[in-house]
Regions:
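Hydrophobic transmembrane alpha-helices of multi-pass small-molecule transporters
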Residues: 1-80, 86, 182-323, 428-453
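Alpha-helical transmembrane segments and, especially, the helix-loop junctions at the ends
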Residues: 113-124, 140-178, 196-200, 349-365, ...
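Juxtamembrane/interfacial segments at transmembrane-helix boundaries in multi-pass membrane proteins
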Residues: 169-182, 317, 325-329
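Hydrophobic alpha-helical transmembrane segments
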Residues: 183-197, 263, 338-353, 384, ...
Length: 453
């Protein structure tokens, strides 16, 4: 094994082992590991590995960080207005079962996530669940974990729901409607929704001990409707701008949006809310509270993870794994295709549980194209590229649900719980995520094969 690959594997493995074992220190561990990659890359200890500070800064997804900060600020004003409490009251008045309430909130988060970034979805829906759990005097952990996982799951339902979907659409030449039906066959939307429906039974099973029925005698009065309007405008603006391509995905001469557009949108509406609050209350107290409540723990952790994954990708480790897949095309028989398809799906689940699925998907897409071509030529089968493309998306998108650090939405959800005084361990998180993910992935795995082979 080359020295660079060995170094990358060792540092990467130690980093994630420590983050699992020392959960309170995850940001420090992530930043330290990121610094090691940058230091080694800057010193030129490996001739083929150049990874300086500027390279690391480019790997950080500032769009995501700005979006989290801006949305958290607006959400704080939203919570202070009393609207989440009122929404909780309305839900309780209509659905008296705790289990059904969690299911409805999870499905609601999933629906929004099909059109809005997963992290933003969690930050918008979670406060309602937290307010509800406070009313019922129960732990918000199951509800928030289910909301986070559900938002990750349904992000793959549409072209605009997740970055991995955008990458796939470019590689497979798909447009917005192709995620619903393509060439007369069901697209990823229906595969994802089928997985979501199956996962409902997992939520009901995990919540089976919550048998209480709840009733309310009065409803909360909302103090200010402006934060609610700003949050709705945030969602609407994110949806509308999602139809505008980024520079890398735009055609020559086509108008495109900047890479940090979503982050700027979220920060803009928070700024409007902050100005409105100062004018209305004639003091800075609420704005100071909003800035203080931004989850800097999550922001630092994500920044560190982005740099780490950038280093792993720069070292060529992910690409080497992809090359290995491309080299085992086999005979091109139906069984060979099935084995390759199975390998791509479940390998994607495994790796996306520990690393960000965006660089992984970007690396694997050209590999999938090569593998499809090799299999078709070897066995003479007419293999549709969407078989492996959609299989990759099923594995890469849903796999991030398994671990707390496998997806930004999970990290954001756990950050909100931490703010409420609830530290969620890896074991507790995975008691929900593993059965949920397996149910959704197996459903998608079977459906994609039946539809496209």
């Amino acid at each position: 094994m080359p020295a660079l690959s060995a170094f990358t594997i060792v540092v990467f493995a130690i980093t994630y082992i420590l983050m699992f074992a020392l959960q309170k220190y995850r940001p420090y561990i992530a930043v330290t590991s990121a610094a090691i990659f940058v230091l080694v890359g800057s010193m030129g200890l490996f001739s083929e590995f150049r990874y300086g500070i500027l390279d690391a800064l480019k790997e950080i997804d500032w769009n995501v960080l700005m979006m989290i900060a801006g949305t958290m600020g607006t959400v704080y004003l939203f919570i202070e207005s009393g609207m989440p409490k009122l929404m909780s009251d309305v839900l309780v008045s209509r659905l008296h079962s705790v289990k059904l309430l969690v299911v409805v909130l999870s499905l609601f988060a999933g629906i929004i996530s099909a059109f809005v970034d997963n992290v933003a979805t969690v930050l918008m829906v979670a406060p309602v669940a937290i307010a509800l759990c406070k009313d019922l005097k129960i732990s918000p952990v199951p509800a928030i974990v289910c909301i986070s996982i559900s938002s990750n799951l349904q992000g793959a339902a549409t072209l605009v729901g997740d970055t991995t979907s955008i990458l796939l659409a470019k590689a497979a030449n798909l447009d917005f409607t192709d995620f619903f039906f393509v060439e007369g066959r069901p697209g990823m939307f229906w595969v994802t929704e089928a997985g979501a429906l199956v996962s409902i039974f997992i939520i009901l099973f995990k919540m089976r001990k919550e048998t209480a029925s709840v009733y309310l005698n009065q409803r909360t009065v909302v103090k200010d409707m402006v934060p609610t309007a700003l949050l709705l405008l945030t969602v609407i603006t994110l949806i509308l701008t999602s139809f505008i391509p980024y520079k890398d995905h735009a055609m020559p001469g086509e108008f495109y949006k900047p890479d940090i557009s979503n982050g700027l949108i979220c920060l803009f509406y928070f700024a409007v809310g902050a100005i409105w609050t100062v004018v209305k209350n004639k003091n800075w107290d609420s704005v100071k509270g909003a800035i203080k409540e931004i989850d800097y723990y999550t922001l630092v952790l994500l920044a560190g993870l982005f740099v780490i994954i950038g280093g792993v990708t720069q070292a060529g480790l992910i690409e080497k794994i992809g090359d290995l897949i491309a080299g085992i095309g086999g005979s091109g028989s139906r069984m060979s295709v099935f084995l390759i398809y199975t390998l791509i799906v479940w390998m994607s689940v495994f790796f996306s549980a520990f690393i960000d699925n965006i660089p992984y998907t970007a690396t694997m897409l050209p590999v999938v194209a090569v593998v499809t071509n090799q299999l078709s030529q070897a066995g003479g089968l007419d293999i549709h590229p969407n078989l492996l493309y959609f299989g990759l998306l099923v594995g890469a998108t849903l796999g991030g649900n398994i671990t707390p650090i496998g997806a930004s939405a999970n990290i954001a959800g756990l950050g909100l719980l931490r703010k409420e005084g609830h530290e969620v361990g890896t074991k507790e998180f995975m008691s929900y995520s593993v059965p949920f993910t397996l149910a959704a992935v197996i459903t998608g795995y079977v459906l994609v094969w039946l539809i496209w082979m």
